[in-house]
Amino acid sequence: MINIRSAKQMDLDRVEMIYNNIHDEEENGMATIGWNRDIYPVRKTAEAALERNDLFVMEDEKRIVAVAIINQIQVPEYADAAWKHEAKEDEVMVFHTLVVDPFEKKKGYGNAFVSFYEEYAKQHNCKELRMDTNVINQRARKMYHNLGYQEVDIVPCVFNGIPDVQFVCLEKCLS
């Protein structure tokens, strides 16, 4: 049975393992995401999110299989995006750093996490959903498109110290 909950301190080792697994997959040519093992996402990414209370984990049969950050923090790169919908900051919920353990892929966990994110946004009275991915991450782009997210812009940037990122900004309006 799938359960999504706020992460706890005791979850950090498993979250770090999932981050390492996705980095291994990319380094072995099994995925194209655009992240960097030494820069992002790393354990400190999860620790900072845990401290803000916006780190969420997905469990299946009590085993953590995916992790994401959900909050109202719009990264600075969003200021350069041509968003289609106007929204006040407190009306926007942002989905960051979704990672499904590569050993658990193709089970619908990504879709289920996005569904949770949308419900979470509604519960917090947010009408605008925003997220991003790297232009090279075709798997994520396809999934988000299939879930009704519109790519509104591609912003070139240095993201979290990773150079030459083409930042795809996506949005979906709930109202």
Task: Annotate the PLM regions.
Residues 3-17:
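A short beta-loop-alpha structural element at the N-terminal edge
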Residues 3, 24-45:
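Conserved GNAT-fold acetyl-CoA-binding loop/helix
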Residues 100, 106-119, 142, 146:
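Conserved acetyl-CoA-binding loop-helix of GNAT-fold acetyltransferases
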Residues 69-97, 102-105, 158-163:
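Conserved acyl-donor/pantetheine-binding loop and adjacent beta-alpha core of acyl/acetyltransferases
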Residues 87-89, 127, 134-137, 146-147, ...:
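C-terminal "cap" of GNAT-fold acetyltransferases
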Residues 44-57, 73-77, 94:
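A short helix-loop-beta-strand connector motif used in the catalytic cores of GNAT acetyltransferases and
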Residues 114, 121-132:
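Conserved GNAT acetyl-CoA-binding A-motif
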Residues 54-68:
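Conserved beta-hairpin
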